[in-house]
Amino acid sequence: MTPPSNGQAAETNDHLVQSDNPEHPANLIPSLCAKFWTLGWVTGTGGGASIREDDLVYIAPSGVQKELMKASDIYVLSLAAQAQSLDRRNRVYLRSPPSYKPSQCTPLFLAAFTKRRAGCCIHTHSHWAVLVTLILETQGAGKDREFRINNIEQIKGFGKGFEKSGNLGYHDTLVIPVIENTAHEEDLTEFLEEAMDKYPDTYAVLVRRHGVYVWGDNVHKAKTQCESLDYLFQLAVEMKQLNLPWITDIEPVTPRKS
């Protein structure tokens, strides 16, 4: 049989998204997106999520109301096949839903899977993420390319970096790079990849006036890091309203010896 292309797939591959297991990627993506919708992360069909299970990549479609998504709406492709293809804009999908278009986030999700071996990547349009990039914009050229914050307990929710063990500590500085937005989402790919190369320990990239991409080794880590990051973004916005600095110099407190 000739392989399907341009987002079309053989009907027989519907088995790839059929499972009674709630932890199956095709079931998990809709349930996660429904939760994210309640948080305002994927409003108006924006944002999305993708899960990698070995070589199979499951992706939420474009244009679907995320709180209403079903397993039958999910795209599936082979990660190895994408790595071998020279045409990034004409992807071959193992399975495609009949009524939707492939997500323009796809190449950005794939960057997290190929460059970081991530198991899950989440893209949100969180207004806290957007506000942080706008605040950084007011700092002037050269000071608007990174979000930095330290001495906040929630920073412990992030790993130390790619292929490093352990998590960041309370006194560590969390650094999230910021890239400029483009008219078409897929055109962000090279800038996201450049940020990943420049910041090898980051688990997220902010997109100015747009949102954020967050990834993790698995669904649990991607989700909790996304939650922690949104908490920190909201905190940072409210700190700025109170003229409180994001970076502080605090002496570590050591326990008294008994």
Curated annotation (Swiss-Prot):
A GO BP entry: L-methionine salvage from methylthioadenosine
Residues annotated to bind Zn(2+): 123, 125, 210
Protein name as it appears in the record: Methylthioribulose-1-phosphate dehydratase
Domain of life: Eukaryota
The family this protein is said to belong to: Belongs to the aldolase class II family. MtnB subfamily.
InterPro entries per the UniProt record, alphabetical: Aldolase_II/adducin_N, Aldolase_II/adducin_N_sf, MethylthioRu-1-P_deHdtase_MtnB, Salvage_MtnB_euk
Function, in words: Catalyzes the dehydration of methylthioribulose-1-phosphate (MTRu-1-P) into 2,3-diketo-5-methylthiopentyl-1-phosphate (DK-MTP-1-P).
Transmembrane helix listed as a keyword: no
First-listed, main subcellular location of the protein, grouped into a coarse class: cytoplasm
Free-text cofactor note: Binds 1 zinc ion per subunit.
Annotated stretches, region: Disordered: 1-21
Active site, renumbered: 153 (proton donor/acceptor)
Known pathway: Amino-acid biosynthesis; L-methionine biosynthesis via salvage pathway; L-methionine from S-methyl-5-thio-alpha-D-ribose 1-phosphate: step 2/6
Keyword Cell wall biogenesis/degradation attributed: no
Cofactor requirement: Zn(2+)
Polar residues: bias regions: 1-20
Gene3D superfamilies (alphabetical): Class II aldolase/adducin N-terminal domain
Broad class of enzyme this protein falls into: lyase
EC number: 4.2.1.109
A GO molecular-function descriptor: methylthioribulose 1-phosphate dehydratase activity
